[in-house]
């Protein structure tokens, strides 16, 4: 192409060849005249000469010359335009080097050049290329003709079939439609009954055996009861037995109430006429009267806010209420005193262990799919004397609708309640479970309140003891009045309103903006006609906007236009709409139906029914004897009913044929296939043709009755259909049933055709169809009685064919049956054809992973995969139930071929690889479960005195127990034993079986070797398939270890994943950032088991309700002084603390009033505010609160102290401040002083040994008297947060194609728009090369096209479903308001970068960095990030900038007074910098000498310890801190177990993946001020290089040590990692390992016992036992201080007697430091800056670390291999399937696969199950074009896997691309009780963070101290309220 430039620029000459109309460039040449020219050469094929065209840039050709060129045929010259300039032509000029020939008929000069001969090779290459191009075009033409022919043929067939069908149905009328529906649904009903036969059989069996089983086992248990409480304590009984009454036991139904006249009445009779009156009185009265029914009702909403129809469950009895429902208001008489009425009798609710007796409505609902959850879930109980009613949250109704249950807000018309008015917005209601794209009926219900009923709206409150006064209550105004008042009220000056312009607006403003759209256009460029035309369009648009459904229709149109699973080249909107509509109907409705087993079996049932009908109707056919013509049949005697039946069956056949034609991939092949021809013949087309050929005016001919026997042949393929539908049947049964059906099909087909050809034969009495069926049986069995022989030639030929067929048929089928009975199965399913669209999987894929992959595809990417072909060496039989569950619940066709390793040879799978869409090579991630070598059990002894040189202690193959069992019956001679050898042999046997011997000599049970072997086999398969496919097919490789990572990447594999490395990388990040692995895994998983969820929530609430009743019974017992022998005390010291105040839980030691002396001065109000807790129970268990009381080893250090946030990502142990907290700096000083004060407030004699151990225990008693009202708060919070969690669990991560209207949008604006308008989280972008950039806030969408990037970038988005993603991609219009807002943001960005380029000098290059410049210029980073700002960097920022920052955030500062303290501390840090610089040299010299002495003493001490795989083996926790750990300020990480690949975990803990180069430079400067660092000393730098990068001191507690290999050497971690030998199942070993002092605890799924058993289930059981042992240890020491002291005295004997143990471990010298320490503690806080300077200086001089500070709430992570073990943790998880039959087992496997993810233990992110990573394969691009690669996980956790060249880096720099990672930060207290979207926009604009989740702490039971659970809420809704101490998961903004 020409490159036209301006005249000022000279363009270089480009030598181009013109061949076949295409140009190719050559090297540039310069004309001798000096002018730049462009030269083009064209080959004239006729004359074999060159035609050289010259053009000069500065000259133009006249229009006449252009015309002459066009006339002479040289119009192929390409003209290029640049930025819409006028078209320019180049004037041709000669060259002096060439001989010019002038053509008389042309203006072009033909040139003959001598250099042309040298270019013949190049020209020949061009000719070949031209030939190949011609072949491609020819192939395209052939393909176009073929598609056109197939389309026309299909269209002709469809028209012909439909026309013939309509023609035959004209005689029957519209009633035939009813018959068709009856036949279709009747056959489907029969097929459903057949498919569910095992289920119905089980129901019938249980009906007859249920009563006998109950009576049989009723004596073995006592039922659990729930007491219905009443106010009269004297009538209440604590007896477990039901009181003896004549009435039968009441159930969970509506109980009858006793009114004043003691007459019973029914609720249903009296509630309807009094419902509205009762509700109006309920709102007018301040108190409620009467007694409340004991009803299990979920809608425990607030009595002030429940709807009118909910009053059905709340009956208010009054003396003025008569039976007719007349309610008299006696408020003036009654006053404020409630009326006492007689309470009804106590009712007991029994829960049997095998039955749950409930009311009839719930019993019926169990049979149905849905039932009213509102009346069976939660409870209304009166718990106190003041008639305090426990009310549940309104949001339970939201959960009820999500479970597809009827809402209580809509009743039938007989209830006479008007429907609710729907409002578009309600700030108190959370978002729905439905799609957030458009509001549908459920979402409107969630977001609305009634105006007519005057339902009060109140925010969700915390405890009734709330003294904060921050609750939003609205008790005097209805919602409509409040909403009207809010509209008139002036909006608050929020801190983000100046930045955020994307807010919801009224429709009137939108219409006004639309009317004013064209007022700002340039009227000079438009004529009057266009103006009028635009005005008319504007009027039309405004008219359309008034139509309510216009926007919905418009959105639906855009949705279907963009609903193209395959890209389309057409741009016609109507064609795209119809194509999208057909595809949507195909994939959402018809395809689901066509693949359903019910539909497939229904087709076979209709064929069988037609067989019966044919046998009935054929008997009425008559024909003259010996007249064998087909048209001679007389059908007058056939009943008229048969005509309707025949028409019905023909229409059903037409539908089957058209469905098959529509869904076939190769339609031409389908049309001419055997079975489709049979279907076509039996359609009405044959009747239409026969009627046309043989017209009979006398009677009607039913041609379908003549051709009907051919349809019986459809039963031939019934076996394959039944094998896919009745998958619970064995192969032998399927083959037997298939043989029977095939025989019947051949029999009835042969008999029917013979009847049409030969009947009737009166002489031999073969007249009826059954006679010929008898003849068919005789013929097929080859008996040949001779009573009948065919007469016609056609009959004779058919008989011979049937005889030959039966010979071959019987032998082949019997052989196949024998093989199935006696040979293993190697194929399961139907092998896909080469034309099918399938995905090929190779390798020993475990059945569980296959199930996860298919379920992930079905839930996240429905209809994206048609079939899966699996080649596996594992036995096919183990996939039986998984195969059945996949076929039954998805539309995926699956075929499994395997049973041996030879099935995966490249020669066998060659064809399968070539025709596959994508290839997945997977290894066996569950090798321990499916490998026989790991099932061996070896016994070991406790003797560890092993000597490898002793031959008697070596294990030989014959010494292994397993080998002895195998060789038991061999011919080997038995060993003769002597009496003298008994002792020695016994001793040798013990030594042979000890643990170390097994670890050193046995390779059989080494899991690392097994995984390594599997990886090697996987690599071989990859190499073989790579050579077959030649990288043309995308290949995904999954390995366990990362040994062969470089080899795979060098072979250009499409996707690569190492399961073990990814698992340990997630764990390493989660250690620093709580719960991050669970947050990320939620993005790749979408559970859909609503039934299991419902059951789980019901069971959870029943359990909690049981605790409520127990608590109330305990109160009554204490009040009535009744003693019970079975009363369980919660703790040993319960009686001592029974009357203690709840404030004792808030303050660490409430008895010491000295704690409050430090809260003086200006900080008094602030500290009191931070000590406040909305629920007093929280604080005892929360180590992440703002006033954290845990005395960890890092309590006095700024770096380790993350107040209000467990932001352990930034564990930099230098003296800089908290990274993200608003008020963390002032809390830091407060907490440090308070904690150090706690440590010494009772230490009158500090040198006593017991104080260092006992001072942190204090009053840890877990028992306290908790008010009953707190139970309501817990139930309410759990229900609400489970709802929020399940709502966020719907979000998946997808690849997002940006719509055209978003081109030019700033990424930050686009993410804000998508979240606010559509509820989606846009978190990053991804390129075609899989380069991922998270939170690139300065990236402009579509800007890469300006830099000639070939393909546009895609977005990474979190949304609810694939349909919602398509809706977002189909957005066609964005309001002008948003566009203007986006343009304003872009202009600000450009100005900012312009300023940055001017001031690039003078700041050591840091002003070039984007993040630093934004902090200085735009003040986005305020003083809240003091912790990440270095001391030297603080000095650069001037006081003027700090004052500007302070003024900008004054709105938050007014609400949170911690900012005032932050500014003072900021100044203090500025002063400290100058002081530090003065004393720097003196400190360095002092530190050098101290550090050298430390190294010498450490080397002497390490001689005493063993060296195991690079680290030292120590005795206990104290020895490790004294002799091993370099930096003793780091927190402790305890790792239980030592697997083979633990080096992966330590590697990711060591690598500083969370900091950029900027932070590394800061750390070097900060480390220069550290007392242990000396930059001038080489020994110091080398010795501490690895330790500085590790954030923890690590202790590995294990009884086993893996064998050495070249990867697991831990020498790099020897300075901060120690090893303690011992089993983690022993509590003594755990205490030695420092279990009480560990900040983080990881229990790995390795072997923890003496038995070398690698069985996965046993290892998981050990992990569960260790977890419970740890919990029990903490419970014991929290009960009493003495227990803790006794444990310490017993285990740490020497250390306990050492009275200076802390000083000896941490410091080099003496007691002088203690004086400074005491002086520091005695100071109190004042507002004077001088005292603050003293405080900081004293803190920096000496900080005492107590290594025996007990960490009350360590974060524990347990690794579990198999999810089946979770049943022992949470009994509601049902993962055992052995007690079910085959059909139920398949259903249970599918329903429970991965559904454990919503349980409490998983929500708390305490358990990591390896199965969570199984479905990552389903999230890759070959699966769907909307899939995102799972490599995004590495980007989320901060590991940059992108490798860029210099050019690519420059390209990214030009685009302002940046990437970030996930961090956890505290949420400012300003947002407490405010919606989440406010916090989201604040973090987005002010901090440049993208919030994607919330970490929340919830107490699940107030009766236990250790009951706090974490809630990981991913993708929160807009209206979710922020609570205290919530932390946010954000994607931080970093530059590349």
From Swiss-Prot:
InterPro entries: K_chnl_dom (IPR013099), K_chnl_Slo-like (IPR047871), RCK_N (IPR003148), Volt_channel_dom_sf (IPR027359). Residues 772-788 dip into the membrane without crossing it. It is found in: Membrane. Disruption phenotype: Decreased uptake of the K(+) congener 86Rb(+) by parasites. Slightly prolonged survival of infected mice. Inhibition of oocyst development in the midgut of Anopheles stephensi mosquitoes. It is a multi-pass membrane protein. It catalyses: K(+)(in) = K(+)(out). GO terms for cellular component: membrane. One of its GO terms (molecular function) is potassium channel activity. Partially inhibited by Ba(2+) and quinine. Probably insensitive to tetraethylammonium (TEA). Residues 1141-1185 form a coiled coil. The chain crosses the membrane at residues 175-195, 598-618, 643-663, 670-690, 701-721, 734-754, 791-811. Keywords: Coiled coil, Ion channel, Ion transport, Membrane, Potassium, Potassium channel, Potassium transport, Transmembrane, Transmembrane helix, Transport. Likely a predominant potassium channel in the erythrocytic stages of parasites. Mediates transmembrane potassium transport. Required for the development of oocysts in the mosquito midgut. This is Potassium channel K1. It comes from Plasmodium berghei (strain Anka).
């Amino acid at each position: 192409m020409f490159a036209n430039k301006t005249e000022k620029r000279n363009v270089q000459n480009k030598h181009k060849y013109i061949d076949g109309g295409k140009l190719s460039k050559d090297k540039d040449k310069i004309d001798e005249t000096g002018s730049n020219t462009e030269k083009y050469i064209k080959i004239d094929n006729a004359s074999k000469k060159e035609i050289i065209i010259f053009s000069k840039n500065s000259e133009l050709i006249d229009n006449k010359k252009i015309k002459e060129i066009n006339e002479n045929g040289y119009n192929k010259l390409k003209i290029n335009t640049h930025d819409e300039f006028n078209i320019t032509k180049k004037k041709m000029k000669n060259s002096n080097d060439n001989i010019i020939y002038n053509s008389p008929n042309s203006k072009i000069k033909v040139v003959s050049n001598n250099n042309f001969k040298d270019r013949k090779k190049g020209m020949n290459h061009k000719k070949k290329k031209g030939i190949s191009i011609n072949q491609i075009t020819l192939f395209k033409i052939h393909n176009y003709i073929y598609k056109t022919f197939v389309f026309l043929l299909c269209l002709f067939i469809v028209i012909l079939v439909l026309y013939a069908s309509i023609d035959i149905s004209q005689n029957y009328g519209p009633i035939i439609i009813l018959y068709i529906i009856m036949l279709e649904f009747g056959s489907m009903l029969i097929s459903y009954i057949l498919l569910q036969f095992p289920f119905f059989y089980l129901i019938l069996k249980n009906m007859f055996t249920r009563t006998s089983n109950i009576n049989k086992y009723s004596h073995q248990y006592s039922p659990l009861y729930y007491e219905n409480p009443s106010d009269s304590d004297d009538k209440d009984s604590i007896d477990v037995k039901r009181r003896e009454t004549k009435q039968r036991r009441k159930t969970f139904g509506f109980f009858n109430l006793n009114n004043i006249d003691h007459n019973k009445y029914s609720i249903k009779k009296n509630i309807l006429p009094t419902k509205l009156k009762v509700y109006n009185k309920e709102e007018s009265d301040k108190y409620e009267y009467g007694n409340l029914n004991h009803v299990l009702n979920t809608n425990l909403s607030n009595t002030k806010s429940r709807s009118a129809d909910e009053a059905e469950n709340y009956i208010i009895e009054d003396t003025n209420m008569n039976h007719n429902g007349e309610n008299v208001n006696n408020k003036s008489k009654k006053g404020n005193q409630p009326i006492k009425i007689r309470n009804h009798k106590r009712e007991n609710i029994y829960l049997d262990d095998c039955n749950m007796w409930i009311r009839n409505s719930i019993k019926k609902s169990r049979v149905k799919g849905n039932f009213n959850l509102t009346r069976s879930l939660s409870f209304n109980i009166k718990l106190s004397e003041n008639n305090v009613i426990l009310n549940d949250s309104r949001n339970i109704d939201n959960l009820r609708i999500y479970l597809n249950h009827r809402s209580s807000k809509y009743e039938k018309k007989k209830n006479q309640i008007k429907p609710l008015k729907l409002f578009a917005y309600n700030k108190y209601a959370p978002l729905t479970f439905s799609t957030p794209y458009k509001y549908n009926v459920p979402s409107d219900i969630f977001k609305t309140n009634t105006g007519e009923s005057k339902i009060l709206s109140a925010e969700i409150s915390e405890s009734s003891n709330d003294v904060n006064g921050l609750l939003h209550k609205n008790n005097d105004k209805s919602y409509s009045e409040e909403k009207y008042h809010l509209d008139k009220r002036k909006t608050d000056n929020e801190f983000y309103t100046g930045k955020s312009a994307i807010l919801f607006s009224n429709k009137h403003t939108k219409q006004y903006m639309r009317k004013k759209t064209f007022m700002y256009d340039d009227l000079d460029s438009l004529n009057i006609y266009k103006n009028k035309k635009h005005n008319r369009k504007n009027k039309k648009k405004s008219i359309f906007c008034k139509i309510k459904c216009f926007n919905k229709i418009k959105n639906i149109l855009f949705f279907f236009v963009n609903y193209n699973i395959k890209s389309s080249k057409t741009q016609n909107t109507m064609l795209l709409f119809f194509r999208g509509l057909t595809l949507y109907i195909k994939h959402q409705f018809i395809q689901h139906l066509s693949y359903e087993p019910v539909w497939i079996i229904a087709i076979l049932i209709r064929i069988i029914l037609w067989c019966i009908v044919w046998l009935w109707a054929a008997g009425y056919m008559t024909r003259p004897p010996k007249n064998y013509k087909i048209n001679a049949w007389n059908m007058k005697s056939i009943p008229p009913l048969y005509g309707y039946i025949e028409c019905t069956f023909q229409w059903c056949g037409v539908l089957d044929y058209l469905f098959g034609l529509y869904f076939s991939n190769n339609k031409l092949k389908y049309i001419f296939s055997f079975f489709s021809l049979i279907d076509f013949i039996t359609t009405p087309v044959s009747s239409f043709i026969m009627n046309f050929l043989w017209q009979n005016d006398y009677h009607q001919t039913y041609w379908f009755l003549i051709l009907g026997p051919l349809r019986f042949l459809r039963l031939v393929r019934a076996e394959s259909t039944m094998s896919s539908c009745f998958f619970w049947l064995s192969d032998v049964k399927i083959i037997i049933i298939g043989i029977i059906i095939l025989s019947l099909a051949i029999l009835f087909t042969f008999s029917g055709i013979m009847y049409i050809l030969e009947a009737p034969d009166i002489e031999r009495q073969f007249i009826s169809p059954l006679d010929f069926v008898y003849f068919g049986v005789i013929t097929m069995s080859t008996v040949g009685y001779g009573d009948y022989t065919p007469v016609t030639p056609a009959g004779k030929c058919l008989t011979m064919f049937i005889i030959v067929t039966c010979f071959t048929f019987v032998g082949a089928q019997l052989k196949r049956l024998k093989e199935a009975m006696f040979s293993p199965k190697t194929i399961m399913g139907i092998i896909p054809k080469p034309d099918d669209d399938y995905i090929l999987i190779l390798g020993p894929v475990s059945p569980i992973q296959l199930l996860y992959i298919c379920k992930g595809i079905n839930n996240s990417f429905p209809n994206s995969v048609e079939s899966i072909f699996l080649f596996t060496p594992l036995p096919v039989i183990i996939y039986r139930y998984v195969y059945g569950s996949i076929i039954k619940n998805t539309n995926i066709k699956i075929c499994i071929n395997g049973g041996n390793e030879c099935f995966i040879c490249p020669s066998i799978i060659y064809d399968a690889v070539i025709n596959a869409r994508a290839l997945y090579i997977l290894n066996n991630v569950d090798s321990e479960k499916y490998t026989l070598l790991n099932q061996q059990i070896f016994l070991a002894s406790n003797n560890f005195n092993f000597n490898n040189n002793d031959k008697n202690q070596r294990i030989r193959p014959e010494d292994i127990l397993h080998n002895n069992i195998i060789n038991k019956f061999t011919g080997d001679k038995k060993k003769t034993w002597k009496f003298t050898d008994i002792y020695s042999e016994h001793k040798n046997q013990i030594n042979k079986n000890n643990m170390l011997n097994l670890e050193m000599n046995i390779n059989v049970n080494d899991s690392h070797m097994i995984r390594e072997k599997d990886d090697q086999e996987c690599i071989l398969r990859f190499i073989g398939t790579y050579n077959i496919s030649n990288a043309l097919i995308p290949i995904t490789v999954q390995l366990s270890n990362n040994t062969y990572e470089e080899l795979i990447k060098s072979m250009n594999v499409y996707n690569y994943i190492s399961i073990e490395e990814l698992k340990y990388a997630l764990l390493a990040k989660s250690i620093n950032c709580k719960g991050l692995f669970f947050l990320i895994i939620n993005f790749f998983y979408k559970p859909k088991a609503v039934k299991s969820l419902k059951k789980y929530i019901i069971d959870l609430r029943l359990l909690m309700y049981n605790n409520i009743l127990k608590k109330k019974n305990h109160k009554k017992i204490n009040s009535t002084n009744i003693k019970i022998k079975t009363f369980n005390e919660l703790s040993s010291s319960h009686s001592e603390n029974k009357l203690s105040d709840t404030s004792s839980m808030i303050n660490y030691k409430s008895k010491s009033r000295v704690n409050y002396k430090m809260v003086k001065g200006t900080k008094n109000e602030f500290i009191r505010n931070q000590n406040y807790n909305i629920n007093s129970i929280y604080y005892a268990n929360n180590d992440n609160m703002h006033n954290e009381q845990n005395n960890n080893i890092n309590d006095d250090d700024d770096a380790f102290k993350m107040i209000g946030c467990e932001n352990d990502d930034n564990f930099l142990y230098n003296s800089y401040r908290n990274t993200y907290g608003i008020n963390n700096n002032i809390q830091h000083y407060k907490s440090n002083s308070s904690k150090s004060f706690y440590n010494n407030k009772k230490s009158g004699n500090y040198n006593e040994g017991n104080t260092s151990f006992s001072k942190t225990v204090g009053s840890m008693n877990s028992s306290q008297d908790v008010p009953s009202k707190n139970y309501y708060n817990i139930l309410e919070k759990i229900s609400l947060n489970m709802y929020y969690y399940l709502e966020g669990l719907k979000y998946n991560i997808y690849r997002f194609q940006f719509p055209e209207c978003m081109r030019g949008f700033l990424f930050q604006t686009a993410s804000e728009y998508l979240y606010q308008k559509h509820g989606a989280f846009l978190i990053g972008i991804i390129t075609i090369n899989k380069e991922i950039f998270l939170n690139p806030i300065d990236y402009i969408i579509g800007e890469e096209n300006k830099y000639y990037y070939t393909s546009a970038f895609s977005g990474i988005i979190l949304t609810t479903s694939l349909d919602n993603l398509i809706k977002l991609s189909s957005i066609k219009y964005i309001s002008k308001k948003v566009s203007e807002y986006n343009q304003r943001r872009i202009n600000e960005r450009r100005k900012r970068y312009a300023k940055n380029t001017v001031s690039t000098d003078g700041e050591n290059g840091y002003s070039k960095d984007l993040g630093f410049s934004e902090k200085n210029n735009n003040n986005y980073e305020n003083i809240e990030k003091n912790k990440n700002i270095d001391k030297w960097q603080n000095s650069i920022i001037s006081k003027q900038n700090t004052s500007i920052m302070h003024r900008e955030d004054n709105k938050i500062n007014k609400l949170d007074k911690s900012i005032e303290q932050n500014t003072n501390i900021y100044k203090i840090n500025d002063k400290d910098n100058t002081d530090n610089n003065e004393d720097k040299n003196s400190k360095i010299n002092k530190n050098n000498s101290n550090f050298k002495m430390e190294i010498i003493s450490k080397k002497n001490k390490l001689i005493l310890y063993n060296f195991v795989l690079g680290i030292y083996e120590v005795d206990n926790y104290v020895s490790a801190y004294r002799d091993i750990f370099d930096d003793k300020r780091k927190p402790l990480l305890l790792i239980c177990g030592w697997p083979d690949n633990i080096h992966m975990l330590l590697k990711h803990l060591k690598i500083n993946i969370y900091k950029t180069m900027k932070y590394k430079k800061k750390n070097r400067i900060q480390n220069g001020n550290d007392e242990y660092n000396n930059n001038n000393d080489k020994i110091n730098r080398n010795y501490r290089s690895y330790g500085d990068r590790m954030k923890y001191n690590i202790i590995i507690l294990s009884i086993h040590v893996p064998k050495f290999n070249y990867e697991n050497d831990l020498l790099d971690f020897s300075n901060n990692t120690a090893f303690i030998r011992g089993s983690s199942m022993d509590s003594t070993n755990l205490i030695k390992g420092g279990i009480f002092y560990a900040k983080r605890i990881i229990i790995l799924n390795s072997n923890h016992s003496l038995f070398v058993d690698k069985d996965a289930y046993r290892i998981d059981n050990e992990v569960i036992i260790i977890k419970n042992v740890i919990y029990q240890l903490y419970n014991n020491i929290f009960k009493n201080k003495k227990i803790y002291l006794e444990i310490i005295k017993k285990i740490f004997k020497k250390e306990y007697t050492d009275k200076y143990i802390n000083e000896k471990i941490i410091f080099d010298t003496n007691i002088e430091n203690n004086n400074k320490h005491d002086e520091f503690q005695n100071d109190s806080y004042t507002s004077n800056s001088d005292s603050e300077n003293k405080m900081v200086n004293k803190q920096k001089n000496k900080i005492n670390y107590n290594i025996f500070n007990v960490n009350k709430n360590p974060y524990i992570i347990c690794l579990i291999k198999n999810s089946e073990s979770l049943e022992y943790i949470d009994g509601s998880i049902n993962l055992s399937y052995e007690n079910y039959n085959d059909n139920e087992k398949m259903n249970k496997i599918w329903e429970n696969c991965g559904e454990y993810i919503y349980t409490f233990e998983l929500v708390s992110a305490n358990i990591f199950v390896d199965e969570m990573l199984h479905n990552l394969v389903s999230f890759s691009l070959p699966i769907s074009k909307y899939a995102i690669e799972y490599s995004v996980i590495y980007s989320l956790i901060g590991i940059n896997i992108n490798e860029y060249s210099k050019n690519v880096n420059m390209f990214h720099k030009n685009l302002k691309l940046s990437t970030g990672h996930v961090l956890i930060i505290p949420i400012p207290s300003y947002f407490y009780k405010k919606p989440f979207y406010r916090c989201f926009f604040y973090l987005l604009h002010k901090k440049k963070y993208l919030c994607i989740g919330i970490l929340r702490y919830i107490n699940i039971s107030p009766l236990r101290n250790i009951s706090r659970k974490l809630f990981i809420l991913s993708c929160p809704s807009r209206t979710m309220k922020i609570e205290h101490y919530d932390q946010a998961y954000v994607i931080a903004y970093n530059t590349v």
